[in-house]
Amino acid sequence: MGMTKKALRIFIPVLVAVLLCTACTNVNSPRQERLLRQWQFTQDTTENPVWQEVTIPHDWAISGPFDRANDLQEVIVVQNGESEPSWKTGRSGGLPWMGKGHYHTRITVDTTKWNTLVFDGAMSHADVYVNGEEMVYWPYGYNTFDCYILPHLLQSDTVDIDVFLENKPQQSRWYPGAGLYRNVHLIATNWIHVPVFGVCVRTPEVNSDRAQVWMAVELQNGVDATSAEKENVTIQTDILYHGKTVATIDGQEGVAIVNKPHLWSPETPNLYYARTRVIQNGEVLDEVNTRFGIRSVSYTPENGFQLNGQTRKFKGVCNHHDLGPLGAAVHKDALRHQLAMLKEMGCDAVRTSHNMPAPELVELCDEMGIMMMIEPFDVWNHGKTENDYSVEFEDWWKADITNMVKQYRNNASVMLWSSGNEVWNQVLDDGIGIVTALQDLFHQLDPTRPVTNGMDQARYIIHNGFGAAVELPGLNYRTGRYEEAFEFLPQKMILGSETASTVSSRGVYKRPAVLKDFALYDDHQSSGYDLEYCQWSGLPEQDFQLQDDYNWTLGQFVWTGFDYLGEPSPYDTDAWPSHSSYFGIIDLASLPKDRYWLYRSQWQKNAPTLHLLPHWNWSEGDTVPVFCYTSYPSAELFVNGKSYGRLRHATPEETVRLAQGEVIKGVSPMPEVAEFTVPEWGSNPRPELLPRYRLMWFDVPFEAGTLEVVAYDEKGKKAASEIIRTAGQPHHLDLVWANKDEKPEELCYITVRVVDKEGNLCPNAANLIRFEGEGFIAAANGDAACLDSFVEPEMHAFAGQCTFIMRKGYKGTFTFE
């Protein structure tokens, strides 16, 4: 404790890294694993540092305070149409994540065992010492890595572990978090054992009658790779479904046949276990349980993306890794809550933008039926910020890809890999060579999945060879270039690797409701009418139309599922206090914005959608645009019982007529379009598409009372209705346990609503909500410009609501003023 870090650095890029996220042990197993949860932490660099007790996972920066000066960046953002540097405030969250940190723990180990430390992620530039000797250095904060506790260090069963971390200025263009923010494991095995990442499972042939399951098992003796023959051991793997053995494989490599397999899909996330045992003279030396799914995946120009022989399209979102008010510290209940909200919306896929995910996320996607695109990098060797991964790329890309692919190649939910996001190499001479080298390594490690790349420079990559070199081309935005890309790229398939980037603030509505890029307001909010976007982005309807009308599109990944810390576009240039994103379909407090129901109306096929906006608290004489997001074919709007007309969704043919200026009876008119802020970067927002996917009444006179929408089915019969009432003054708090049905292990998400005496939400309420008692963890309200601390038990309501994250069984009271 208080140990000074050695000046001499021993560089050990260990490739054999993590315990599979799907592996497990029991008390009778020769393999034992435990989480190392209790550590001491300091940022004090003096000879006698002051330590604090912390529980891992731990994000040292999330407690704040927020400050404009935290990672203030002077950069050029080309996507914004900039040619000169400008000050970017809040770009990485406005939290104090930069600097150095030191973690220490003392543990006991079994000195007769081979002991391995596994770090699921350490932010960043991790230097790990065991009993004063450096064991491993790993710079990339998102990847999993390991180190051995070498036998010569074990003079007793007591072991001191020290982890030194350093986050550098301009290391990230979003909030990276800080510290040991993912779990740390200790794995004890016999000297002869299956190394972590040592089991590979594939399902090369799959149909409803039978499936081939191929497996290969690595073996290790201490630090050395070895073989079953050399060690005089046998290896046996049983394939189990719900605890029952359905097939067996003998040896280090082999194939088993599973009859009548239960296939994995988002609708049926069936999972198998492979129980591998290493046996010597009748003694089980090691046992590893690897979870996997049986499914087939293919991508062809003829059939598009097929899962288990059925063509489908990704209905996906991109997500950053932070968990809002919890910061980057991983928590399974929080991840489960996010995925449950997305699945209820109809989402079936997640892209891990732009880094390796936490193992818990992949595990949950396997269990809950969420497909995944796993992406390691935001940059290659040409950076976007001064100290980003480009500094490490040349030395570390092989090790980082190797760890990532070996960690997640057995997971049923992983459908494809991405080699990078909007890398500058798209337009540089070295781009084709690098993307080819990366893809070759991916295929060497996993020949079963394709590799995509999120490309935003469409006007170049379509013709310069880069797009042709990407195995499965992904376009970020650039909806107006899809048809050109399909015509000229040889793959004849286009994936929407990143789409929309519509910006909005929950519960905030700007009038008039017009399509506008880079709209800025004095209150630092974006309109909840879902009509605003950045210069380089667009609206959901542009991507809906491409996916609906062209069979050569493979689906989309919307930017983003959840708001995240950092990147507060359009308030990103000297616009403090904005410090978190506006892109999310769901806000930073895990409260859905109106856009949630727009996507649900298109994606959720198991239940109808009917959603009305905005709120109905305006001033007498106001004219208010009213929108309805619905899966029903038509709906009628009423104010205090008076009809304002029945509208239906426009047909594809009618959108062409709308674009030509025609007014069509019974179809929503097109919204007006404001001038582009940066015309040369603006994409055509195609306002004629909106009446196809939403119903819009633009000139509804406000009268206090009720706003009602009535939906009609295909036969013209009333099918559903929704009512919004004018709210009175705040009267009391309404508490909703938002994640109760998810059966959380620890965390309760409590939605706190400020309501009037009749229970109607007060949509403009900004009261300060306080909790007094035990069990508080964090709070948030979804306001990207709010500087209330996440870790204090009080939070202002935003648009009448906020979220308190509590421990199960919390005791106390909520009050407001």
What are these regions (language model features)?
Residues T22-A23:
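C-terminal motif of bacterial Sec signal peptides marking the signal peptidase cleavage site
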Residues V27-N115, Q171, G177-L180, I192, ...:
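Extended carbohydrate-recognition surfaces in non-catalytic/accessory domains of CAZymes
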Residues R31-E33, G93-F197, G222-V223, H242-V246, ...:
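Accessory beta-strand-rich segments of carbohydrate-active enzymes
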Residues E33, D59-R68, E74, E84, ...:
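Extended substrate-binding grooves/exosites of carbohydrate-active enzymes
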Residues L154-S156, A216-T300, W697-D699, E703-G705, ...:
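Extended acidic/polar, glycine-enriched regions
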Residues M215-L219, R277, C628-T630, V710-A711, ...:
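Beta-strand-rich structural segments
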Residues A228-T237, E267-Y272, L637-A650, L658-E675, ...:
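Short flexible loop/turn segments that cap and initiate beta-strands
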Residues Y299, A607-P625, S631-E636, A719-Y749, ...:
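Short S/T/G/P-enriched beta-strand
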